[in-house]
Amino acid sequence: MNYSHDNWSAILAHIGKPEELDTSARNAGALTRRREIRDAATLLRLGLAYGPGGMSLREVTAWAQLHDVATLSDVALLKRLRNAADWFGILAAQTLAVRAAVTGCTSGKRLRLVDGTAISAPGGGSAEWRLHMGYDPHTCQFTDFELTDSRDAERLDRFAQTADEIRIADRGFGSRPECIRSLAFGEADYIVRVHWRGLRWLTAEGMRFDMMGFLRGLDCGKNGETTVMIGNSGNKKAGAPFPARLIAVSLPPEKALISKTRLLSENRRKGRVVQAETLEAAGHVLLLTSLPEDEYSAEQVADCYRLRWQIELAFKRLKSLLHLDALRAKEPELAKAWIFANLLAAFLIDDIIQPSLDFPPRSAGSEKKN
C-alpha cells in the first residue's frame, strides 16, 4: 500500500469531499472531538492503514506521527477506530450505492449471485463473523454486503429485491421455504440449488411428491423438470404451500462419479453413513426457480446457475489480495472496523480499475498506418 500524501489525495477523491466526510462521520458518531484527529479524512486514512494497510495499532500510530498525519497513542487509536466501525460500513455501502446508480441494468434481467463467507478472530477456532454479499457477474463487482455474527444463517431474501434481477444461490440457501417464498411472491426471480430432501415436496393436490421417483423416471443422461409445491415444513412463518419449477440437471458420468466420491469422503470423515438415495441423487443438480418455462429453458436456467462460481472466486480474491481471512482484532467493534475498512478498499480498487477494464485495448493490427 502506498502511503504518500499524493496517493492519498487521489484515493480520497473517489470517496468524497472532506466536508462531506466530516458531516457523515459526525452523524455516525465517529468524530465527536478533534483533539488528536483533526478531521474525518484523517480518521479514514488511519482506518485504511490499520485494515488493508496491514499495520498493527502501534505501527499505525508510529507511521502517522512520522508522516505528520496524526499524533496519538495506540490505545487512543483503538478507541477511535472502534467508534468509527459503523461509519466505515456506511462509506462502503455508499460506494456500492454510487456504483449501482452508474451500472444499473436498463434492459433484460440482471443476475445477482449471493453467498457468504466466515471470518475468524485471531487464534483460529470457530468463526465469529459471517460476511454476506451479492455479486454482479456482468460487471464483475460486488453489489451488496451485510456483516453478521456467525449464528446468522444464509437467507435468499437477505438483500432488497428489484424487479429486473435473477437471484442465484447454492444449496446452503435452499433449505428455508420462508426465504424462497419471499422471492416467489416478491419482485425478483430466483435460481437456487436444493437438496433432494431439503424441502417439503408436495404435488399440486397437496400429497407428498416422490422426488426419487421423479429422478428415476428421467431418461439416462437427460435433464428433466416438473412443477412442485413447497410446503412449510411445520414452520408457520413459511406460510401456505407455493408452486415452484423444479429442474433436474443430469451430470455427465465422470462428474457424477466425482460428486458421489466427494459425498462419501465427506461423510466418512464425519463418521456418517450415506443413504443409498442420497448417493443416487448426487448424480443430478437440483435447481428450484421462479423463471417461467416459456421464457427460460431448463438449459438456460442451468447456464445461469453455472455462473455462481464467479462469486466464489471473488471471495478468494478478497482473502488472497486483502487477506480478509486474516482478521487482526478480537474486540467486536475493532474487528468490524477492520473488516469494513478492507471492504471499502476492495470496492475502491474495483471502481478505480473498472474503467480500464471496460475500455477494449486496441490490437496491433488495428493501428492506423500513416
Swiss-Prot record:
Pfam families under this entry?
DDE_Tnp_1
Q: Which Gene3D superfamilies match?
A: Transposase Inhibitor Protein From Tn5, Chain A, domain 1
Q: What InterPro entries does the record point to?
A: RNaseH-like_sf, Transpos_IS4, Transposase_11
Could you cite one Gene Ontology molecular function of this protein?
DNA binding
Q: Domain of life, per the record?
A: Bacteria
* Keyword DNA damage on entry: no
Q: Does the keyword RNA-binding apply?
A: no
What's one GO BP annotation on this UniProt entry?
Answer: DNA transposition
Keywords per UniProt: DNA recombination, DNA-binding, Transposable element, Transposition
Family, according to the entry, reads as follows: Belongs to the transposase 11 family.
Give the function comment from the record: Involved in the transposition of the insertion sequence IS186.
Protein name stated in the entry: Putative transposase InsL for insertion sequence element IS186A
Q: Which organism is it from?
A: Escherichia coli (strain K12)
Taxonomic classification, please? Bacteria, Pseudomonadati, Pseudomonadota, Gammaproteobacteria, Enterobacterales
Gene name as annotated: insL1
